[in-house]
């Protein structure tokens, strides 16, 4: 795809405040989008509904679970379980059909992010309290990764994401500027990156020097693995984006969006990465290592930010600071 354009499709209207989380699952031939918001609500949407009305695509409303804003969500592969986390310091495991929920406790402050592993058996949450909690699907706290743990982050845990095929491998991104990769089964730290560069603790130890592994100006804001898990893409508040090849521990591509990166999604049908920023939605093609399309959010209004992203084929769903969910169709240009 040498060049492309983003065409705005019909908005999904329902939320009244920032849409902080989006997740698409495919169940029984249906494609369901889950969205979470600062308005303390979660909606599920039938993306292929034929009903033509403002709220026609909404299947269910999940509310009453959080007393403060919802900061993120994830949904199991079979669509039966949803996990939400919020600024009230808790998480909840929801049965998506009955809407009943189980409380996740253990954090001392706002919970910012959540991820469910590849076989739907592990849940990890990250918090302002600088800890990550591992739960089972019954809601039991299995492991608390805090300041007493070697190699732990020294800032807020802004984002977490499980490897798409390795059930115990987790990546985490922090306000301390680092991305870390962990094996939760062995509780082992595997890798650390700062500014796209691998932090070699062993080499620093040999040279008797202190490794550089803290820089708040590089606060990590979003991340996503490639479909096969070989590449981890992450973005910073600085505007920088990095593609890191996990096996060789090298940064293979980078890009500067200038303004903070708020969200990242990996393309399903094309070799692209989508970035949501404080000004635009950007499509980065990994084959040519360049931007092939962008959408200026000022066309919607001043100060509009893209806080969450999810691909459905060639359609990119964008959760905005206004509360709207805007689908953008990625089309090849003539």
From Swiss-Prot:
Pfam families membership: WD40
Keyword Repeat found: yes
Gene3D superfamilies linked to this entry: YVTN repeat-like/Quinoprotein amine dehydrogenase (2.130.10.10)
SMART domains: WD40
Keywords: Repeat, WD repeat
InterPro entries assigned to the protein according to its UniProt record, in alphabetical order: G-protein_beta_WD-40_rep, WD40/YVTN_repeat-like_dom_sf, WD40_repeat_CS, WD40_repeat_dom_sf, WD40_rpt
Superkingdom assignment: Eukaryota
Keyword Repeat: yes
Ranges occupied by WD repeats: 14-55, 65-104, 106-145, 152-192, 215-256, 257-294
Family that this chain belongs to: Belongs to the WD repeat G protein beta family.
Protein name: Guanine nucleotide-binding protein subunit beta-like protein
Organism for this UniProt entry: Encephalitozoon cuniculi (strain GB-M1) (Microsporidian parasite)
Lineage of origin: Eukaryota, Fungi, Fungi incertae sedis, Microsporidia, Unikaryonidae
């Amino acid at each position: 795809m040498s060049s492309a354009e983003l065409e705005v499709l019909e908005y999904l209207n329902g939320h009244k405040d920032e849409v902080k989380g989006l997740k698409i699952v495919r169940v029984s031939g249906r494609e369901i989008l889950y969205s979470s918001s600062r308005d303390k609500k979660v909606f599920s949407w039938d993306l292929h509904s034929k009903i033509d009305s403002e709220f026609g695509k909404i299947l269910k409303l999940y509310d009453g679970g959080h007393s403060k804003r919802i900061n993120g969500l994830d949904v199991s592969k079979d669509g039966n379980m949803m996990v939400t986390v919020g600024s009230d310091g808790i998480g909840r495991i929801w049965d998506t059909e009955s809407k009943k929920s189980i409380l996740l406790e253990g954090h001392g402050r706002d919970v910012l992010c959540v991820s469910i592993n590849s076989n739907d058996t592990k849940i990890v949450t990250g918090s302002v309290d600088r800890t990550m909690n591992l739960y089972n699907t019954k809601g039991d706290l299995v492991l608390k990764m805090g300041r007493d743990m070697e190699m732990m982050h020294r800032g807020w845990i802004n984002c977490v994401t499980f490897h798409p095929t390795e059930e115990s491998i987790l990546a985490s991104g922090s306000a301390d500027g680092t991305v870390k990769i962990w094996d939760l089964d062995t509780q082992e730290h595997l890798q650390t990156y700062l500014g796209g560069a691998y932090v070699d603790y062993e080499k620093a130890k040999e040279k008797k020097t202190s490794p550089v592994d803290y820089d708040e100006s590089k606060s990590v804001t979003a991340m996503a693995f490639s479909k096969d898990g070989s590449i981890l893409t992450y973005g910073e508040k600085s505007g920088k984006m990095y593609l890191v090849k996990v096996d060789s521990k090298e940064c293979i591509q980078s890009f500067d969006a200038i303004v903070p990166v708020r969200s990242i999604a990996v393309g399903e049908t094309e070799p692209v990465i989508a970035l949501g920023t404080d000004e635009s939605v950007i499509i980065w093609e990994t084959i040519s290592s360049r931007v092939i399309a962008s959408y200026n959010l000022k066309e919607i209004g001043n100060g509009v930010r893209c806080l969450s992203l999810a691909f459905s084929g060639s359609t990119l769903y964008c959760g905005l600071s206004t509360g709207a969910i805007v689908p953008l169709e990625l089309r090849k240009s003539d």
